[in-house]
């Protein structure tokens, strides 16, 4: 239920008719300012200066460093992402970012095809299938991010237009502003993912060198060329070996790992940006407690709440495919890692990497779910104050706002199949436990076999 259309540039009158009488006694009001259509997009009149977006606490300014970093590995091929003005962000097929994206997609497709042909030769099992799923998820993520990039200029314009009123009084900027929150969370995920990838490489290299040192039947001297041909043999069954191709494979593999992590990182940044504005609305509502408030204030609050809900719906329609892909990806890899919990490993470094990877994956999944669930939690936190509004301040707008907060599901979704709430996290945990018990029963014969001979 939408409220009346308001001009947010007008502040509600707190006097009972005094200012209206004074305005009638004044001479003619000056002619209205000319409104330019391009400026009206952000509620700015042509005779006024455009806002300095660099100094505003806006979502676009908070996320652009990480979106620019993602462009280095061919995610979100947008032009003008570093511009402070969101209206300069655009998508173009004929652009350098799009060209880089196509190159990375072709390279990832080669790795996917190499893995697929290799598995056809040796036979597909539940455990060696993980590599194919990994490259398949990365390729799907590239496609989803291209589709999202086409919609992003419209998304960031509507987002900026909606959140500009929140950068001015009566709304307050929290001590830890939006940029700070996004940066802390993003740097934590990037740092932990770099640690996970580094441990993977160290584990693979040490396992390779130990095997050569301990096996008398292996006369090969440890070298970069031999390491690549041993660990990435599935690629060189399709491509001829050369040191340049080997280095490129390592770079593409690292880029794929970044894309695999960036899906959750991007959802987390979106969730931070949306829940931050709902938190500001809640803070404003709480400050009105025990005060006599005129109806126009509640009209404005409900209007801003409705605008945020409309923004959430628009953002959700643009990125629900990414949310669905991320959840399926996390569900599969958590189940796969838990399946290997009882397996014996050969070297201590293998145990270190395995447990770090497992805990990181579970922690990242839970963190993203809880961050997204904060949107739903923040959208309802003002209910307690609204229900205690005094009879002197009670009005139909308060009743409408309570009804909307109570009945509407304000949350991101995966194609509307499910909503990212705290309840879903526990449901997903129960699903993982159920599948894991079934998988462990099927994998019992493989666990009894133990480790394969080292020098075979």
Curated annotation (Swiss-Prot):
Its main location: membrane. Residues 115-128, 206-245, 343-350, 442-456 are extracellular. Signal peptide: none annotated. D-maltose binds at residues 196-197, 234, 253, 257, 353. Expressed in Gr5a-expressing sugar-sensing cells. Keywords: Cell membrane, Membrane, Receptor, Transducer, Transmembrane, Transmembrane helix. The chain crosses the membrane at residues 92-114, 129-150, 183-205, 246-271, 319-342, 351-373, 422-441. Sucrose binds at residues 131, 196-197, 234, 257, 353. One of its GO terms (cellular component) is plasma membrane. Changing residue 135 to A: Abolishes sucrose- and maltose-induced currents. Residues 1-91, 151-182, 272-318, 374-421 are cytoplasmic. Changing residue 353 to A: Abolishes sucrose- and maltose-induced currents. Changing residue 253 to A: No effect on sucrose or maltose activation. Changing residue 257 to A: Abolishes sucrose-induced current but has no effect on maltose-induced activation current. Induction: Expression is increased by starvation. One of its GO terms (molecular function) is taste receptor activity. Changing residue 134 to A: Abolishes sucrose- and maltose-induced currents. Residues 1-30 are annotated as: Disordered. It is a multi-pass membrane protein. Belongs to the insect chemoreceptor superfamily. Gustatory receptor (GR) family. Gr5a subfamily. Homotetramer. This is Gustatory receptor for sugar taste 64a.
């Amino acid at each position: 239920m939408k409220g009346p259309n308001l001009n947010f540039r007008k502040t509600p009158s707190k006097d009972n008719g005094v200012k209206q009488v004074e305005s009638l006694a004044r001479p003619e009001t000056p002619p209205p300012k000319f409104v330019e259509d391009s400026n009206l997009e952000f509620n700015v009149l042509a005779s006024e200066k455009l806002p300095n977006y660099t100094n505003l606490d806006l979502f676009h300014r908070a996320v652009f460093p990480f979106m620019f970093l993602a462009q280095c590995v061919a995610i979100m091929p947008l032009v003008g992402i570093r511009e402070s003005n969101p209206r300069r962000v655009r998508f173009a097929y004929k652009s350098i970012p799009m060209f880089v994206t196509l190159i990375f997609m072709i390279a990832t497709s080669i790795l996917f095809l190499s893995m697929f042909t290799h598995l056809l030769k040796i036979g597909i099992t539940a455990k060696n299938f993980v590599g194919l799923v990994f490259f398949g998820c990365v390729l799907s993520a590239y496609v989803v991010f291209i589709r999202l990039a086409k919609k992003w200029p419209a998304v960031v314009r509507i987002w900026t237009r909606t959140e500009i009123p929140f950068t001015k009084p009566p709304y307050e900027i929290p001590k830890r502003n939006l940029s700070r929150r996004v940066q802390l969370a993003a740097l934590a995920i990037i740092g932990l993912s770099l640690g996970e990838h580094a441990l993977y490489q160290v584990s693979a290299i040490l396992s390779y060198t130990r095997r050569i040192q301990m096996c008398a039947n292996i006369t090969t001297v440890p070298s970069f060329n031999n390491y690549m041909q041993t660990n990435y043999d599935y690629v060189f069954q399709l491509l001829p070996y050369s040191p340049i191709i080997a280095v490129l494979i390592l770079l593409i593999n690292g880029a794929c790992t970044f894309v695999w992590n960036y899906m959750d990182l991007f959802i987390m940044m979106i969730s931070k940006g949306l829940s931050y504005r709902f938190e500001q609305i809640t803070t404003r509502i709480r400050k009105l407690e025990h005060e006599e408030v005129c109806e126009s204030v509640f009209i404005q609050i409900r209007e801003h709440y409705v605008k945020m809900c409309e923004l959430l719906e628009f953002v959700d329609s643009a990125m629900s495919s990414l949310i669905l892909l991320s959840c399926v990806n996390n569900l599969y890899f958590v189940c796969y890692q838990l399946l290997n919990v009882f397996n014996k490993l050969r070297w201590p470094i293998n145990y270190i990497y395995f447990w770090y990877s497992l805990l990181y994956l579970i922690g990242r999944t839970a963190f993203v779910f809880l961050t997204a669930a904060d949107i739903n939690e923040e959208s309802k936190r003002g209910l307690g104050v609204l229900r205690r509004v005094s009879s002197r301040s009670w009005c139909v707008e308060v009743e409408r706002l309570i009804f909307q907060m109570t009945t509407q599901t304000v949350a991101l979704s995966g194609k509307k199949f499910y909503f990212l709430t705290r309840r879903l996290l526990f449901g997903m945990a129960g699903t993982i436990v159920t599948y894991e018990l079934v998988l462990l029963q099927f994998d019992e014969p493989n666990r009894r076999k133990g480790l394969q001979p080292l020098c075979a």
